[in-house]
Amino acid sequence: MQDIEKNIKRIADYYKVKHQEKKLVEELGELLVEISKNMITNKVTENTASEIADVIILLTQIVYLYDIEQEVYDKFIYKIDREIKRILRRGNNNEKD
């Protein structure tokens, strides 16, 4: 796993923030297309996993380049905890907002 983290940082350092921001926007668009196809067809397209991987890789690079790892981690934990509390308040009711 450390090799992956090291390589993600190496790629980010090579391309720099502006390039990777543009690339992230492009990849988010491609993921949006795939998710839209999935919603229309009620099937997961072949490219979905690839597009998700692209977005995760680029988001990881942006978090590193912005130097906000701790802030993102803290928000990640906060938002998950908040949603679990919402679910628990609803009890067994599966209605979604």
Predicted regions and their residues:
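Flexible "arm" and connector segments at domain edges
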Residues: 1-97
